[in-house]
UniProtKB/Swiss-Prot annotation:
It is a multi-pass membrane protein. InterPro entries: Na/H_antiporter_dom_sf, NhaA. It catalyses: Na(+)(in) + 2 H(+)(out) = Na(+)(out) + 2 H(+)(in). PANTHER family: NA(+)_H(+) ANTIPORTER NHAA, SODIUM ION/PROTON ANTIPORTER NHAA-RELATED. It is found in: Cell inner membrane. One of its GO terms (biological process) is regulation of pH. This is Na(+)/H(+) antiporter NhaA. NCBIfam families: NhaA.
Length: 439
C-alpha cells in the first residue's frame, strides 16, 4: 500500500515539479551567461541575518550565512528531512521492509553507486585535480526520474515504478552516508553531544505518545543550528530527525472506523432545505476531524505536508542558485571533471544498475519482478543516471567557492549527464513498452 501511495503522490505532482525544476535550472544558466550575471552573483552572496537579541541564528563560524549557503545548508535540510521520512516509511512498511522486497533494488543501487565512481576515477584518477568529486555521479534524483517515467503514463508496469523508486531510495541512503562521512571537517564534539541528547529526548517523548509536529520541528531547528556549528554537514540533522518522528498514530484504524460510524449514526438530522449547520452538527464534524488527525501518524502527516514546499519551492530555489553554469571558457567548461561526471551518470549508472540486476537474477539470488524485461530494464537503468539534485549538492560540497572552474565543470557534467540519461531512458522505454489498447 505504501508504494502505491508514493506512486499516487508522485503521479499527481511529479511532471509539474520536474518541469519547474528544469525551468529553474535553465533560467539559472541563462542568467549566469547574461549581462545581469553580476546581479545574480550578488544575490547568491547576499548575507542574511535572523537576530534574536545579540544572537544571529543564521551565522556560522562568526560569519553571516550567504543566500546560497542558507539555501544549501538550511532549506535543503528540509529536503533531506523529507528524504529521511520516505526512507523510514519504506524501511518500516514499504519496499525495503523485508529482504525479499529490498534485495533487488539494493543490489541494483550498489551497482549504480559503484560503477559511476569507477568511471569517474578512470577519467580523474586519485591525486589528480578534481578527484575529490568522485561521489558526484552516485545519486539518482527520485522526483526527476519518476517525473520522466510518468510521461509514459499507463504503459509503465507498476513493478518498474516500484523498482526505480526503491533503488533511488537506497541511492539516497548512500548519498547521505557519503555526505556524513566524507564532507565533514573539524568536528566540534560538544555541539554533537548536545544534539545527540536532544535526539534522545525527542525519541522518548515520541515513545510516550507526544505527536505534536510543531514541537519536533522547533527542536529540529535547534539541532540544525548545533550541526551547523559542529563541522558535520547540517543537512544530516534533517535525516536523523526523520528517524525520531513517531510512525505510530495515536488512534488505531479499527477504532477510528468504529468511532466514525458511531459519530455518523448520531449525526443530528435537520430540515433538508437548511444551508446552515447547527452547533450539534458542527460539534460532530469536529469529532470526525479530530479523529482523522489522530489516525494519521506524525511521520505520514509531516511527509504529506512537506511534499508541496519541497517540490515547488525548495528544490526550484536550489536549482536556481546552483545550476548557473558559465559557458564561456571552451575547454574549461567541459574539462576532465565535466566529462567524468557526465560519463559517470550516463554510462556508469546504466552499466552498474543493469549489470548488477542481471547478475542477481541470473544467479537466482532474487527473481525478476513481474512486468520487467531485459529491454525495459535498460530504460530504467538509463533513468537512474538522472542525478540532478543530490549530484549538484555533492558537487558544491566537493569544490565550493575554492575551485570555481572545477565546480562549473561539475555542474555542466551533472546537467548534461542528467539530460542525456533522461532523454535516452525515455526514448528506450517509449520504444520497448507496449502500447495499451483502449477499451
Amino acid at each position: 500500500m505504501t508504494i502505491l501511495r508514493t506512486m499516487r503522490n508522485f503521479s499527481s505532482m511529479n511532471i509539474a515539479a520536474s518541469i519547474l525544476l528544469f525551468v529553474a535550472a535553465i533560467a539559472a544558466a541563462i542568467i549566469a551567461n547574461s549581462p545581469v550575471a553580476p546581479v545574480y552573483q550578488e544575490f547568491l552572496l547576499h548575507e542574511l541575518h535572523l537576530q534574536i537579541g545579540n544572537f544571529n541564528l543564521l551565522s556560522h563560524g562568526g560569519e553571516n550565512l550567504r543566500m546560497i549557503e542558507f539555501i544549501n545548508d538550511g532549506l535543503m535540510t528540509i529536503f533531506f528531512l523529507l528524504v529521511g521520512l520516505e526512507i523510514k516509511r519504506e524501511l518500516l512498511v514499504g519496499e525495503l521492509s523485508s529482504f525479499r522486497k529490498a534485495a533487488l533494488p539494493f543490489i541494483a543501487a550498489c551497482g549504480g553507486m559503484l560503477f559511476p565512481v569507477i568511471v569517474y576515477m578512470s577519467i580523474c584518477p586519485p591525486g589528480s585535480a578534481g578527484s575529490q568529486g568522485l561521489a558526484i555521479p552516485m545519486a539518482t534524483d527520485i522526483a526527476f526520474s519518476l517525473g520522466v517515467l510518468s510521461l509514459l503514463g499507463s504503459r509503465v508496469p507498476l513493478s518498474l515504478k516500484i523498482f526505480l523508486t526503491a533503488f533511488a531510495v537506497v541511492d539516497d541512503i548512500g548519498g547521505i552516508l557519503v555526505i556524513a562521512l566524507f564532507y565533514s571537517s573539524h568536528v566540534s564534539y560538544g555541539y554533537i553531544l548536545i544534539a545527540a541528547l536532544l535526539y534522545v529526548l525527542l525519541y522518548f517523548i515520541g515513545k510516550r505518545g507526544t505527536t505534536n509536529k510543531i514541537f519536533f520541528l522547533v527542536i529540529g531547528v535547534v539541532i540544525w543550528y548545533l550541526f551547523l556549528q559542529s563541522g558535520i554537514h547540517s543537512t544530516i540533522s534533517g535525516v536523523i530527525l526523520a528517524f525520531v518522528i513517531p510512525a505510530k498514530p495515536r488512534l488505531d484504524v479499527g477504532k477510528y472506523i468504529e468511532h466514525i460510524r458511531h459519530t455518523i449514526a448520531g449525526f443530528p438530522v435537520v430540515e433538508s432545505g437548511s444551508i446552515v449547520l447547527t452547533n450539534e452538527q458542527i460539534a460532530k464534524l469536529k469529532e470526525v476531524e479530530s479523529a482523522s488527525d489522530r489516525v494519521i501518524s506524525p511521520l505520514q502527516s509531516l511527509e504529506d505536508n512537506l511534499h508541496g514546499a519541497v517540490n515547488y519551492l525548495i528544490l526550484p530555489l536550489f536549482a536556481f542558485v546552483n545550476a548557473g553554469v558559465v559557458f564561456s571558457g571552451g575547454g574549461e567548461l567541459v574539462g576532465s571533471v565535466g566529462m567524468a561526471v557526465a560519463a559517470g551518470l550516463l554510462f556508469g549508472k546504466f552499466a552498474g544498475i543493469y549489470f548488477f540486476t542481471w547478475l542477481a537474477i541470473k544467479i537466482k539470488l532474487t527473481p525478476m519482478p513481474p512486468g520487467m524485461t531485459w529491454k525495459n530494464l535498460s530504460g530504467i537503468a538509463l533513468l537512474g543516471g538522472i542525478g540532478f539534485t543530490v549530484s549538484l549538492f555533492i558537487a558544491n560540497l566537493s569544490f565550493g567557492a575554492n575551485y570555481p572552474v572545477l565546480l562549473n565543470q561539475a555542474k555542466f557534467g551533472v546537467l548534461s549527464g542528467t539530460i542525456l540519461s533522461g532523454l535516452l531512458g525515455y526514448i528506450v522505454l517509449r520504444i520497448v513498452l507496449p502500447v495499451r489498447k483502449r477499451k
